[in-house]
């Protein structure tokens, strides 16, 4: 059964709108990762955004619980049901139906669609929710309904806000496998397994803790797909289900170990963590020293340590990650698109950690011998493992788990604090915590005049070094920040890079402006000093000519978003952007790849608006008025009460503080150069306009001219087709008579290399020519060696022969007893492969 599709279809038939899984990185500063199905509906539940036109929703949401408040990382591999990454099936009501329908829908799906027996189902409810008890009694005897307290059956989003009692459906997995003292309904054992949680959001909790009834109660439910899959397959552990089978097979092949061996927990850790690594990398999270990137790093390193336990001393996880990408490619197409990138990044991170893993393990094992009687691991050693060998603290604790020990946290924290004191503050720290308070007290916000002009006289209010310490004089070859009394330089923002240019003093260039940024409301420009400048100097500030090219790309970005919404639908919204002088990059919400027809329509629409020579129009107005006029706003962005609105007549209207062209005709032309996936539900378009558009057209024209010359045909398509036909015919050429043929004990032996032609067809021709044959033909193509072999009335199997030879080439072979093929990337081993092929054949013939 396709549980995901069954669930979504069931609720769609009940009038629910189906929502795609939102990215694992939410647009919510309070969350590290998307950890529940309700996250994408949080603003609806809290009233920040109005209820949708269809007040019922359903989704299958990818969730991540590693790091932050919800962290299952340390339990993964040691329990039957914990995962870092999992799918949560859910249905939601926004002030529409409530308890009765939610319970009815859940019971129907669980008993009819999933086929669970009613006699095996148990229900928990909040101790004060008599209404839910009465509703459940229609389906379940009262002795299988248990009342529980706030700890188990009351849900709230935070200390204040929407909240309410919840009801959970449990299934009895049978006493046959569970005989522990806690294996009773309501106990801590695994016999009674929770499969579905129904949250009845009917209250609002005030800041002082008082509960008030909501005028329109809502429903939020969640059910783990992995858990249901295991139950349907009568498995007592999620990792034993068919969802994880391809991963277990790959790990078994890599380790030459059986999944049912003593290393079963390590199998499970690697399988789980490979899924998390694959999805996080594919959705744009990268290995880092902090935040989400560090959580990703911790997950990978924990997996590598478990691989190490199973004897894997080289990079391996990237191969398991590749299997994940293939396994989920039908439901999450971006995994297939990004598979190569994901595997490469995973491999490189593995290589980095493996450089220190062996040494770190030696230190760890040595330190184990000196554990005190309380089994407390030295905090200083744990810190050294962290600081020198890259062992995250939870990895060290995980290694200590099997020894019944734990880290001396006080000692570890003390070492960490000492390092922080020694360390020089990072740029981010300087920016966030530096003497900006002193700067803000000393200087009022400088005046930005860049909308009206690209050049103006200005007074240098102050110069600052890289630590933002004020300096009196800036000398040649220094890089310093300057604060001008008024400035034409636009500060980086809204996706557009900061202005560059120059400062002139006494008609001479005194400094090159490398960049412009806004810190706490002040526009600073980064300078490379050419001629000494000091506080109070009068200068001429001049923006570089690239400003116009940036403006062209910025205006083109607005036209692009408008075109995307027209072609793809109003669901398109900006998810990120970059505007430079030579290109633009625009990320937007859309669930699938754009086809050629859609891309052509978008490009044509943008160019149509350019050719209309539409004037830009800038207005300042209250935020509500701007939204009423249909101005597009960036989701999640905080706006002031009064906003700047940029429009190009009917073509585009957006809230924007950036620099734009006065007329779309100045953009010149627009070309999409690339469309790709960024993460789940987010696509990216890269494009050029203005001078970059002309340069691209010029280069393409030159390439076309060269192609015509090489093909000796002014019709390039016809020339290419003719060339393809020629290549095809050459590949069909008969086997070269130059291939060496030896006759040994009545069997014709052919082992050789060809430069062109279809080697499989060559084998067929050889088999038709000779009554008894052993043949293996090699060919180098696309930085690989491919081989084909045929056996006819000879004492060896083709598939065995091919596979043995392929291993020298770093590959694998497959086929039948009479025919097989293989390939590998180790081109330098070709001669060794030839020798092995011949020696293996001779041995078989002599045997």
From Swiss-Prot:
Top-level taxonomic group: Bacteria
Keyword rRNA processing listed: no
Q: Which cofactor does it need?
A: Zn(2+)
Cited InterPro entries: aa-tRNA-synth_II/BPL/LPL, Ala-tRNA-lgiase_IIc, Ala-tRNA-ligase_IIc_anticod-bd, Ala-tRNA-synth_IIc_core, Ala-tRNA-synth_IIc_N, Ala-tRNA_ligase, Ala_tRNA_ligase_euk/bac, DHHA1_dom
Reactions catalysed, semicolon-separated, are: tRNA(Ala) + L-alanine + ATP = L-alanyl-tRNA(Ala) + AMP + diphosphate
Tell me the function of this protein.
Catalyzes the attachment of alanine to tRNA(Ala) in a two-step reaction: alanine is first activated by ATP to form Ala-AMP and then transferred to the acceptor end of tRNA(Ala). Also edits incorrectly charged Ser-tRNA(Ala) and Gly-tRNA(Ala) via its editing domain.
Q: Under what name is this protein listed?
A: Alanine--tRNA ligase
């Amino acid at each position: 059964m396709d549980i995901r599709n069954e669930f979504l279809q069931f609720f769609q038939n009940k009038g629910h709108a189906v929502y795609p899984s939102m990215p694992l990185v939410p647009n919510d500063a309070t969350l590290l990762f998307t950890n529940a199905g309700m996250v994408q509906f949080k603003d609806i539940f809290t009233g920040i955004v109005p209820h949708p036109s269809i007040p019922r929703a359903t989704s299958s949401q990818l969730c991540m619980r590693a790091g932050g408040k919800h962290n299952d990382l340390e339990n993964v591999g040691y329990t039957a049901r914990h995962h870092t990454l999992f799918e949560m099936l859910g249905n939601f009501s926004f002030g529409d139906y409530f308890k009765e329908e939610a319970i009815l829908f859940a019971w129907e799906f669980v008993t009819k669609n999933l086929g669970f027996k009613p006699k095996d189902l148990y229900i928990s409810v909040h101790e004060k929710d008599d209404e839910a008890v009465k509703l459940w009694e229609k389906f379940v005897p009262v002795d299988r309904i248990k009342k529980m307290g706030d700890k188990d059956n009351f849900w709230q989003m935070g200390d204040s806000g929407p909240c309410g009692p919840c009801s959970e459906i449990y299934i009895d997995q049978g006493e046959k496998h569970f005989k522990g003292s806690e294996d009773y309904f309501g106990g801590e054992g695994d016999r009674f397994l929770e499969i579905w949680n129904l949250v009845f959001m009917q209250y609002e909790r005030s800041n002082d803790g008082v509960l008030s009834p909501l005028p329109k109660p809502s429903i939020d439910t969640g059910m783990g797909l992995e858990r249901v899959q295991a139950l349907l397959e009568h498995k007592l552990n999620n990792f034993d289900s068919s969802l994880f089978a391809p991963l277990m097979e790959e790990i078994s092949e890599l380790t030459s170990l059986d999944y049912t061996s003593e290393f079963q927990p390590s199998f499970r850790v690697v399988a789980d963590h490979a899924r998390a690594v694959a999805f996080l990398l594919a959705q744009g999270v990268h290995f880092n020293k902090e935040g989400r990137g560090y959580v990703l790093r911790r997950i990978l390193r924990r997996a590598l340590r478990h691989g190490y336990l199973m004897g894997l001393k080289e990079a391996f996880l990237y191969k398991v990650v590749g299997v994940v990408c293939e396994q989920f490619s039908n439901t999450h197409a971006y995994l297939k698109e990004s598979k190569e990138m994901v595997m490469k990044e995973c491999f490189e991170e593995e290589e980095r950690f493996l450089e220190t893993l062996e040494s770190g393990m030696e230190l760890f094992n040595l330190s184990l011998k000196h554990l005190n009687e309380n089994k407390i691991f030295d905090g200083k050693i744990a810190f050294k493992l962290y600081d020198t060998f890259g062992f995250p603290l939870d990895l060290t604790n995980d290694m200590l788990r099997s020894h019944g020990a734990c880290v001396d946290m006080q000692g570890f924290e003390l070492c960490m604090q000492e390092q922080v004191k020694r360390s020089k503050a990072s740029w981010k720290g300087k920016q966030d915590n530096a003497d900006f308070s002193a700067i803000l007290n000393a200087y009022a916000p400088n005046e930005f005049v860049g909308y009206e002009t690209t050049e103006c006289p200005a007074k240098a209010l102050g110069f600052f070094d890289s630590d933002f310490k004020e300096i009196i004089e800036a000398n040649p070859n220094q890089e310093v920040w300057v604060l001008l009394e008024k400035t034409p330089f636009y500060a980086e923002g809204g996706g557009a890079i900061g202005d560059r240019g120059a400062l002139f003093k006494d008609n001479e260039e005194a400094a090159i402006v490398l960049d412009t940024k806004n810190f706490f409301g002040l526009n600073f420009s980064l300078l490379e000093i050419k001629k000494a400048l000091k506080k109070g100097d009068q200068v001429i500030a001049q923006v570089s000519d690239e400003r116009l090219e940036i403006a062209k790309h910025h205006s083109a970005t607005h036209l692009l978003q408008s075109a995307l919404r027209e072609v793809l639908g109003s669901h398109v919204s900006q998810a990120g952007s970059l505007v430079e002088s030579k290109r633009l990059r625009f990320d937007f919400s859309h669930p699938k790849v754009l086809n050629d027809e859609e891309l052509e329509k978008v490009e044509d629409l943008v160019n149509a608006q350019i050719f209309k020579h539409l004037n830009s129009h800038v207005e300042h107005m209250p935020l509500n008025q701007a939204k009423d006029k249909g101005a597009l706003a960036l989701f999640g962005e905080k706006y002031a009460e009064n906003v700047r609105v940029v429009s190009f007549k009917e073509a585009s209207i957006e809230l924007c503080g950036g620099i734009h062209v006065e007329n779309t005709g100045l953009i010149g032309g627009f070309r999409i150069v690339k469309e790709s996936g960024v993460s789940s539900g987010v696509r990216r378009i890269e494009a050029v306009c203005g001078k970059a558009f002309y340069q691209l057209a010029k280069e393409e024209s030159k390439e076309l001219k060269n192609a015509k010359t090489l093909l000796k045909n002014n019709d390039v398509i016809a020339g290419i087709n003719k060339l393809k036909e020629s290549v095809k015919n050459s590949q069909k050429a008969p086997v070269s008579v130059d291939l060496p043929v030896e006759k040994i004990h009545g069997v014709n032996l052919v082992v050789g290399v060809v430069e062109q032609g279809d080697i499989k067809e060559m084998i067929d021709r050889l088999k038709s020519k000779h009554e008894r044959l052993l043949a293996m033909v090699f060919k180098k193509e696309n930085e690989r060696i491919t081989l084909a072999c045929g056996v006819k009335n000879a004492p060896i199997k083709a598939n065995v022969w091919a596979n043995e030879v392929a291993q020298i080439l770093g590959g694998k072979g497959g086929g039948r007893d009479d025919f097989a093929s293989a390939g590998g990337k180790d081109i330098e081993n070709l001669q060794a492969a030839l020798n092995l092929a011949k020696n293996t054949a001779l041995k078989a013939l002599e045997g």
